C-alpha cells in the first residue's frame, strides 16, 4: 500500500544522510593540514580529545552496565517491564555515543585544514569548516532515524497482533521504542556534563591566569592550558551538543509516534493509526533530504563581510525551512492523514517557534545589538556592574522564548485537535508534531552549530602556529560568525527540549496504560463510581483515576521537587566547573613558576599535564549530577506514585526550561560583550573595561556551556526515566 511505500522513505533517507556525511568527511581529509607546526598542534588536540572520550566512555559503560542489570531484573525477574527494554536501552546509548565520536573525530581533523584554507581565502575556509560541521549534523539525523526504523521493523515483526483490540499492537510497539530514548538521554547527559566541565575548567583556567594575570592573549602557545582549552571546544561543543540534539531528535519522533498510536486506541481504525505513527518519521526523513540541499547551497563571495557570511549560512538554513514546509503538506497529503492540512500547520508552528527563539537569542547575545553593547558599557564601572547587568539581561531574555513556546503549545494543540480543547489525544499529538517540525531541519542547523567549534579551533591553530595577521583576521571572522550560530543553536536545543519534554510527559500516561495492563488491571474504578476498561481509557480518564488535580498534595509536592531539581542540578555543575578550574589555575601558575623561560617563549610548557587535569576533573565531577537525575524520578515514583511523578516532570520542565534560557543567554551576552570591547570599543584590549568584561565572560562560561545546556538533558532524561520506570511505579508505589 501507499503507506508502507512511504514508510521506506525513512530508512532510505537515513542511509543517504550517512553516505553524504562520509562524502563530506572524505572531501575534507583530502585538503592539506598546512605547516609542520600546524600539523603538530592539531595532533596534540586530537590526542587530548580522544583520550578524554576513551575515559568518558569507560565511565558511561559502567553506568550502563549497572542500569542494564537493573532493567533485566525488572523485565525478566519481576516482569514489571517490557522484555525488550534492556536491549533497546543499549542501542540508544551506543548510537548516541557513536554520533558524538564521529562528529568529534571529524572536527579535530578539520580545524587545521580550515586554518590552512583561510591562508588562501575566506570562502574556502568557510566551506571546509561548514561541510565538516555538516558531517556531525548528518551523522546525528542519519543514525537517529536508522535506529528508529530498525526498531520499528523488528518490533512490528515479532510482537503478535491483539485479536480483541487491534489498535493495541502499535501502542505496545511505540511505547517500547520510547525506551531506547533513555539510552540516548543517559549517554547525552554524561557527554554534556562531562564535556561541559572539561571545556570550561580549561577555558576559565586559561583565561584567569593567561589573560588576567600574565596578560598574554587567548590561544597563546605560552599558556600551558591552551591545548586543553582547544580540546574542550571539541569535547563540549561538538560531542556534547551532538549527543544532546540526537536525543531531542529521537525523543520528539518517538514520543509523537506513541501519542499518534494513543490517539486512535479506542477507534478500530488501524489504518489511520499507522498513518499517525509514521507521520513524524516521514517529516524527519524529508527534513534530511532537504537539509542536504541546504548544505550544498552555503557559499560566499571572496571579499565577504561578516554580514555576507551570516547571510550565506542563514540562506542555507532558511532554504531548508521553506522547502520543508512545502514538503510536509505534500507528504501528509500523500499519506491522507486525517486533518492533514491542520497537522501540517502544526509543523509550521514548530519551525516558527524555533526561528523566534533563535532570533531572540541572537538579539540578546550578539554584539551587533543594544543589549550586549549596553552590557559592555557597564564595564566602565568595574566587574560587579557587568555581573549585575548580565544577570538582569539573562532574566529578561526569557520572556520572548517562553511566550513563543506557550503560543506554540496552544496553537499546535488547537490545530491538531480540530480547535476542540476536549480532544486531548489529537491535541497532544499536535504538540509532538510541532517538536518534530522544529527539529526537522536538524541536519543543517546542527551543521551551522558544529561549525562554531571548528572555526574556533582553526583560530587557535593559526594563533599558535604563528600564521600572519591576515589569516587571523579571516579565522576571527569565521569564529565570531560561529559564536552567533552557536547561540542560535543553543536556543534551538532548549526550545526543542521544552516541546519534546511535553510530548514525553504525555507519552508517560501511555506507558502507565501498558504497565497497568501488564499487571492484569483490566478495569479502572473511577472515584465517581464509574468503571472504564484500561485498554480504552482516555488521557482524561487516567487523570481522573489518579486524581491529578492541582489541589492534590502529591502533585504539588512533585512540582516543588521538580523545580528544585533544576536548581540543584545547576548548582552541582557550576560548583564542579569552579573546582576543576581551581585545579587548572594552580597547575598553570605552577608551570609559570617552575618551568623557566615559558613567558619568553624559550621553553615549551607541559600541555599534557593540563589536559590530564581537565580529564580527571570532568570524570570525577560528572557522576553525581547524572545519578541524581536518574534517581529522582524513580524515588518520587516509589513514594508518591504516578501522581507525584507527573508533578515532578511538570515542575522540572517549566523551571528547567526558563532557567536554561536565562543561563544560555546571560553567558552568551557576557562572552560577546568582551568581544565587543576587544573590537576596539570602550578602550579596547588591555583597558580597564576589558578586564571587567573578561570577568563577566569567565562567569558566563559555565553558565552557557555547562549548566545551561545540561538542563535540556535533565528535562528530557527525567521524563525518559519516568517512562522506563512506569511499570515499577504502577506496581510498587507507596501512596
Residue ranges, per PLM feature:
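Hydrophobic packing and interface segments
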Residues: 1-735
Amino acid at each position: 500500500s501507499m503507506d508502507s511505500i512511504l514508510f521506506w522513505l525513512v530508512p532510505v533517507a537515513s542511509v543517504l544522510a550517512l553516505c553524504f556525511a562520509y562524502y563530506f568527511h572524505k572531501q575534507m581529509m583530502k585538503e592539506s593540514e598546512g605547516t609542520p607546526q600546524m600539523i603538530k598542534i592539531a595532533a596534540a588536540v586530537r590526542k587530548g580529545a580522544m583520550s578524554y572520550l576513551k575515559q568518558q566512555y569507560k565511565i558511561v559503560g559502567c553506568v550502563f552496565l549497572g542500569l542494564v542489570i537493573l532493567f533485566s531484573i525488572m523485565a525478566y525477574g519481576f516482569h514489571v517491564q517490557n522484555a525488550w527494554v534492556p536491549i533497546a536501552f543499549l542501542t540508544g546509548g551506543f548510537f548516541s555515543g557513536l554520533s558524538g565520536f564521529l562528529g568529534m573525530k571529524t572536527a579535530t581533523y578539520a580545524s587545521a585544514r580550515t586554518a590552512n584554507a583561510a591562508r588562501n581565502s575566506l570562502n574556502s575556509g568557510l566551506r571546509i569548516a561548514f561541510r565538516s560541521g555538516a558531517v556531525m549534523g548528518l551523522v546525528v539525523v542519519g543514525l537517529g532515524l536508522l535506529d528508529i526504523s530498525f526498531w520499528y521493523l523488528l518490533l512490528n515483526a515479532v510482537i503478535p497482533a491483539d485479536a480483541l483490540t487491534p489498535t493495541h499492537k502499535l501502542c505496545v510497539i511505540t511505547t517500547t521504542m520510547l525506551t531506547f530514548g533513555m539510552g540516548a538521554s543517559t549517554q547525552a547527559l554524561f557527554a554534556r556534563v562531562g564535556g561541559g566541565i572539561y571545556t570550561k575548567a580549561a577555558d576559565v583556567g586559561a583565561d584567569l591566569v593567561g589573560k588576567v594575570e600574565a596578560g598574554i592573549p587567548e590561544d597563546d602557545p605560552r599558556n600551558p592550558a591552551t591545548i586543553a582549552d582547544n580540546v574542550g571546544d571539541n569535547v563540549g561543543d561538538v560531542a556534547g551538543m551532538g549527543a544532546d540534539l540526537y536525543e531531542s531528535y529521537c525523543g520528539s519522533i518517538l514520543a509523537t509516534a506513541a501519542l499518534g498510536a494513543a490517539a486512535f486506541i479506542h477507534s478500530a481504525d488501524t489504518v489511520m493509526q499507522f498513518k499517525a505513527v509514521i507521520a513524524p518519521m516521514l517529516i524527519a526523513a524529508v527534513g534530511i533530504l532537504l537539509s542536504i540541499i541546504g548544505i550544498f547551497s552555503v557559499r560566499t563571495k571572496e571579499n565577504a563581510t561578516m554580514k555576507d557570511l551570516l547571510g550565506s549560512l542563514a540562506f542555507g538554513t532558511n532554504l531548508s525551512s521553506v522547502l520543508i514546509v512545502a514538503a510536509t503538506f505534500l507528504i501528509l497529503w500523500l499519506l491522507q492523514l486525517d486533518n492533514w492540512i491542520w497537522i501540517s500547520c502544526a509543523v509550521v508552528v514548530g519551525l516558527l517557534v524555533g526561528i523566534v527563539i533563535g532570533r531572540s537569542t541572537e538579539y540578546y547575545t550578539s554584539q551587533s545589538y543594544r543589549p550586549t553593547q549596553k552590557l559592555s558599557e557597564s564595564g566602565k564601572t568595574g566587574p560587579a556592574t557587568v555581573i549585575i547587568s548580565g544577570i538582569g539581561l539573562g532574566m529578561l531574555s526569557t520572556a520572548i522564548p517562553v511566550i513563543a513556546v506557550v503560543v506554540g503549545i496552544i496553537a499546535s494543540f488547537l490545530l491538531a485537535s480540530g480547535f476542540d480543547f476536549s480532544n486531548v489525544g489529537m491535541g497532544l499529538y499536535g504538540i509532538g508534531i510541532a517538536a518534530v517540525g522544529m527539529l526537522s531541519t536538524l541536519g543543517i542547523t546542527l551543521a551551522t552549530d558544529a561549525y562554531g567549534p571548528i572555526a574556533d579551533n582553526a583560530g587557535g591553530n593559526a594563533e599558535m602556529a604563528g600564521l600572519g595577521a591576515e589569516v587571523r583576521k579571516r579565522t576571527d571572522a569565521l569564529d565570531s560568525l560561529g559564536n552567533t550560530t552557536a547561540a542560535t543553536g543553543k536556543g534551538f536545543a532548549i526550545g526543542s527540549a521544552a516541546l519534546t519534554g511535553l510530548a514525553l510527559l504525555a507519552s508517560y500516561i501511555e506507558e502507565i496504560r501498558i504497565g497497568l495492563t501488564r499487571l492484569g488491571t483490566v478495569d479502572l474504578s473511577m472515584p465517581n463510581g464509574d468503571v472504564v476498561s484500561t485498554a480504552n481509557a482516555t488521557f482524561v480518564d487516567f487523570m481522573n483515576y489518579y486524581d491529578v488535580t492541582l489541589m492534590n498534595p502529591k502533585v504539588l509536592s512533585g512540582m516543588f521537587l521538580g523545580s528544585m531539581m533544576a536548581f540543584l542540578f545547576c548548582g552541582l555543575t557550576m560548583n564542579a566547573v569552579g573546582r576543576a578550574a581551581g585545579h587548572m589555575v594552580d597547575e598553570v601558575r605552577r608551570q609559570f613558576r617552575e618551568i623557566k623561560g615559558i613567558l619568553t617563549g624559550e621553553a615549551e610548557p607541559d600541555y599534557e599535564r593540563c589536559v590530564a587535569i581537565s580529564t580527571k576533573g570532568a570524570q570525577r565531577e560528572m557522576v553525581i549530577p547524572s545519578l541524581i537525575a536518574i534517581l529522582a524520578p524513580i524515588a518520587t515514583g516509589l513514594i508518591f506514585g504516578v501522581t507525584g511523578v507527573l508533578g515532578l516532570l511538570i515542575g522540572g520542565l517549566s523551571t528547567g526550561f526558563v532557567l536554561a534560557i536565562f543561563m544560555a543567554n546571560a553567558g552568551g551576552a557576557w562572552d560577546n560583550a568582551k568581544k565587543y570591547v576587544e573590537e576596539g570599543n570602550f578602550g579596547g584590549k588591555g583597558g580597564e573595561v576589558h578586564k571587567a568584561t573578561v570577568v563577566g565572560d569567565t562567569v558566563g562560561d559555565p553558565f552557557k556551556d555547562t549548566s545551561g545546556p545540561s538542563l535540556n538533558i535533565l528535562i528530557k532524561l527525567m521524563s525518559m526515566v519516568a517512562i522506563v520506570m512506569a511499570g515499577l511505579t504502577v506496581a510498587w508505589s507507596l501512596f
